[in-house]
Amino acid sequence: MRPAILGVTTQSVPATYCMSRGNAASVARFSSGPMPNPIVWNVDPVLVRLGPLTVRYYGICFGLALATGFAVWFTRVRRFGESAAFAEQFLYFGVPAVIIGGRLGYCFFYAPQIYLANPLRVFALWQGGIASHGVAAGLAITLWAFSRRHHITWTRLSDYFAPAVALSVGWIRVGNFFNSEVIGRPASVPWAVVFARHDLVPRHPAQLYDLLIGPFTYLVLLAVERRNIRPIGSGLIAGTFLTVYFGLRIFVEQYKDFYVEQLREMPPFRSIEQWLGFPIHTGQWLSVLPVLAGMFLIGRAMRSGVRLSEIARTNH
């Protein structure tokens, strides 16, 4: 066994240990002999303890996500001719939208029975539980309200904002990794990770798969924007973000291990799943609507928009 660095080691994990902590059916396909040196992740999610106060890696990552998102938003808004005051004002609406939307999304979609039994737990943010789909819904509503307040189209604001979300969301997945949450299914891949604070089963590092989606989507948005296919405000950038990001989320969700699946247990969703013959998890169901909305925005932009290069030629 190699020495631990920040709680990280690589060592053989006997299948019998996995059986003792994990689901036997989940690991039955593994050999009864030693596992091939998975990474063992056993990092304390608390970085610093100051008496009753704690500084957690997740909190730092959340702050970095907000800072990254605002920096990209501010740069884009200024580049397209809006004032600094306009960019800063959105901060006072956007941050609450992220927190409130993400928290309510988690409570409603993933653990409604817990929070209906004790509604005050909704405010217990330190216990964790923020859903990215709730964040997306909160930001969409906030962008609409902000656009009405400032007499600017919702699609224009969304085209400004989409790359900011794509580049910042990865920080949240880093925080999930430090918390040993949103873990993947049992796996025998060479890069499998044992989240020792959860169990001793080698698993897909699903948080890192999600982490890669954001920067990839950001690069796609830059490529689309640089091709001058349609002007900012057509909704093409926002539509591309919704389609690519949440489309990839549908793919990655299949590698996650799920412990709360209230949405898929509802009769309409359960019936569709039985008809299809394979499981569709809550995160996949929640990603379908953003993908459809993105495809609608792309189609609308391509039908009604004009090329940015054509506008430039007209201005000359």
Task: Locate predicted features.
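Low-acidity, Ser/Thr- and Arg-rich intrinsically disordered low-complexity segments
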Residues: 2-3, 12, 16-29
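Absolute N-terminal positional cue centered near the fourth residue
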Residues: 3-4, 22, 38, 301
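Hydrophobic, membrane-interfacing alpha helices
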Residues: 29-316
